[in-house]
C-alpha cells in the first residue's frame, strides 16, 4: 500500500508522515488506498481512455489540469483539486508531468497542464529528453514469454513503446504484474544506441524505445 499524501504549507505535497524538508506534519490530503485508486484512474485517463474520462489530450499528450480535476471529481465524490495535485506531485515513478505553473507544481492546486510521462496506447508524440541512458537496462516479464522474446525481441504490444527499467529489481517488480516468479532480460543499451536505436528516459526510472531486437537481449541468471 502506498504512503498517504500530505501537504506542507511551505514546501508542498509529500508522501509519508513528515515533510522531508522541514519535518512538519503538514495537512492530510489522501490515505494510501485512495491515492492508489486516484493514480490508477488518472493514469488510465491520460494514457488510454481520455474520451471516456471526459477530457481531451493534444498531440503531445497534454490536457488542462482543471479539466482533469473536473473528471476526477466526477469519478470520485471524495476527490478534489488538492488530491489530484498531490497524486501528480508525489508519484514515485514520475508517471505524470505538469507544466505551466512554474516552480509551483508541487504546491498549487489550479492551472497548468498535465500529461502521462509514458505508457500511452492513445496516439501521442512525446518530445525527447536529454537525460543520459545507462549502459544496461532491464525488462521483466512472465516465463511463458521467454521463447517468443528470444525469437522476435521486445515489441510495444498494446502500448506505443517498449518500457525498460533502470535496475533488475525494478524490472522484476514490473514482471510480477504478469507472473509470480518473473524472469528478467538484460538489454545492451550501449549497443542499441551505437546502432542508432533511440532510447528515452521517462519519469524517474523508466526508459522507452520503439522495440528491442533479440541481438541486444540476454536472460539474467537468477
UniProtKB/Swiss-Prot annotation:
GO MF entry, a single one: NAD+ poly-ADP-ribosyltransferase activity
Similarity comment: family membership: Belongs to the KptA/TPT1 family.
Pfam families in UniProt: PTS_2-RNA
Organism placement in taxonomy: Archaea, Methanobacteriati, Methanobacteriota, Stenosarchaea group, Halobacteria
Superkingdom per UniProt: Archaea
GO biological process: tRNA splicing, via endonucleolytic cleavage and ligation
Organism of derivation: Haloarcula marismortui (strain ATCC 43049 / DSM 3752 / JCM 8966 / VKM B-1809) (Halobacterium marismortui)
Summary of the function given for this chain in its UniProt record: Removes the 2'-phosphate from RNA via an intermediate in which the phosphate is ADP-ribosylated by NAD followed by a presumed transesterification to release the RNA and generate ADP-ribose 1''-2''-cyclic phosphate (APPR>P). May function as an ADP-ribosylase.
InterPro entries the record matches: Ptrans_KptA/Tpt1, RNA_2'-PTrans_C, RNA_2'-PTrans_KptA, RNA_2'-PTrans_N
HAMAP family according to UniProt: KptA
Coiled coil: none
Protein name: Probable RNA 2'-phosphotransferase
E.C. no: 2.7.1.-
Gene, per the UniProt record: kptA
Amino acid at each position: 500500500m502506498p504512503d498517504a499524501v500530505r501537504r506542507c504549507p511551505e514546501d508542498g505535497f509529500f508522501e509519508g508522515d513528515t515533510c522531508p524538508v522541514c519535518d512538519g506534519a503538514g495537512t492530510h490530503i489522501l490515505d494510501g488506498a485512495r491515492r492508489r485508486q486516484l493514480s490508477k484512474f488518472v493514469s488510465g485517463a491520460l494514457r488510454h481512455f481520455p474520451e471516456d474520462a471526459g477530457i481531451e489530450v493534444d498531440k503531445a499528450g497534454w490536457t488542462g489540469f482543471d479539466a482533469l480535476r473536473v473528471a476526477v471529481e466526477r469519478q470520485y465524490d471524495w476527490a478534489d483539486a488538492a488530491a489530484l495535485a498531490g497524486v501528480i506531485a508525489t508519484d514515485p515513478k514520475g508517471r505524470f508531468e505538469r507544466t505551466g505553473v512554474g516552480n509551483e507544481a508541487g504546491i498549487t492546486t489550479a492551472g497548468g497542464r498535465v500529461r502521462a510521462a509514458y505508457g500511452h496506447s492513445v496516439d501521442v508524440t512525446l518530445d525527447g529528453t536529454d537525460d543520459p541512458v545507462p549502459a544496461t537496462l532491464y525488462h521483466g516479464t512472465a516465463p511463458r514469454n521467454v521463447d517468443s522474446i528470444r525469437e522476435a525481441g521486445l515489441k510495444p504490444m498494446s502500448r506505443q513503446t517498449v518500457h525498460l527499467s533502470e535496475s533488475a529489481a525494478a524490472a522484476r517488480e514490473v514482471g510480477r504484474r504478469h507472473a509470480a516468479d518473473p524472469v528478467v532480460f538484460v538489454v545492451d543499451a550501449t549497443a542499441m544506441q551505437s546502432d542508432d536505436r533511440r532510447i528515452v528516459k521517462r519519469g524517474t526510472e523508466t526508459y522507452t524505445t520503439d522495440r528491442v531486437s533479440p541481438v541486444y537481449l540476454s536472460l539474467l541468471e537468477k
